[in-house]
Design a protein with these regions (language model features):
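Canonical AAA+ ATPase core
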Residues: 85-90, 107-118, 123-160
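Conserved alpha-helical scaffold flanking the Walker A/P-loop in AAA+ ATPase domains
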Residues: 28-31, 84-104
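Helical mechanochemical/support elements of P-loop NTPase systems and associated helical scaffolds
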Residues: 4-7, 11, 22-25, 48, ...
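P-loop (Walker A) phosphate-binding loop of NTP-binding proteins
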Residues: 44, 78, 146
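Pre-Walker A (pre-P-loop) alpha-helix and adjacent loop at the N terminus of AAA/AAA+ ATPase modules
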Residues: 2-47
Length: 160
């Protein structure tokens, strides 16, 4: 058996310890991660979407950040922000949640369109922009987003 196949089987075995009964979904998610694609999982709350994302992060040794999206999550929570430092007499950048390798966007369709837009920039361009300055996101960078079924309380459709 090839080394790559053994590595894939090992990763899936580790994730299966946390998530049971979703072998086809696990294989597709791993394929997307290895291809550096982004993943959108739709299902009702409480079926293990977050557990699966965290298990992949651990199995792959990726730095993971998770944001539970609600209408009050601001774009700066994702991108980071600048704060004035009086001692240095200048602004300092404080990194946001997107400065990681695997970003778990939990219940993305509960976020405002402005916050979703900040995430889309990171996904499409591999960077965040704060105060007109673009900052690269660490690579590899993969987003696993979850959404509740459209029409569930407090949700809004994601842009195409």
């Amino acid at each position: 058996m090839h080394t790559e196949q053994m590595a894939i089987r090992s990763i899936l075995a580790q994730v299966r310890k946390a998530v049971r009964g979703k072998d086809q979904v696990l294989a597709r998610v791993l394929l997307s991660i290895l291809a550096r694609g982004h993943i959108l999982l739709e299902d009702i709350p409480g079926v293990g979407k977050t557990t699966m994302a965290l298990a992949f992060s651990k199995a792959l040794g990726l730095r993971c950040q998770r944001v539970q999206f609600t209408p009050d999550v601001m774009p700066s929570d994702l991108t980071g922000f600048s704060v004035y430092n009086q001692e240095r007499r200048g602004f300092e950048y404080h990194a946001g949640a997107l400065m990681c390798n695997l970003f778990l966007a939990d219940e993305l369709n509960r976020a405002t369109s402005r916050t979703q837009s900040a995430l889309l920039e990171a996904m499409e361009e591999g960077q965040v922009t704060v105060d007109g300055v673009s900052r690269p996101i660490p690579q590899p960078f993969v987003v696993i987003a979850t959404q509740n079924p459209v029409g569930a309380a407090g949700t809004q459709p994601l842009p195409d």
